């Protein structure tokens, strides 16, 4: 958790987040490990991570990649097609609302594993 919080602090610096833009106290939703299998329709189509009352508390989401996988990137369609490779130990942080529509492409050769970590 300390390493993840260190990356969150980097995110805040990179985007010049001011104290009035960040909650004084926050937590992390229970982590969820996701597995996507190759040679199946295992992928996650375009979506956002805040859809209803229950998920509206999320203000930042992290994907921690648990393995190396050259295929199965996370793609942000409305951010100039930015994509992030599945590289073990890498962490992608992004706001969960509608401007950050993203998808998880399906892996090709081996399973893809990631941990989802929404901040509340």
Task: Map each language-model feature to its residues.
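Fe(II)/2-oxoglutarate oxygenase catalytic core
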Residues: 1-91, 99-120
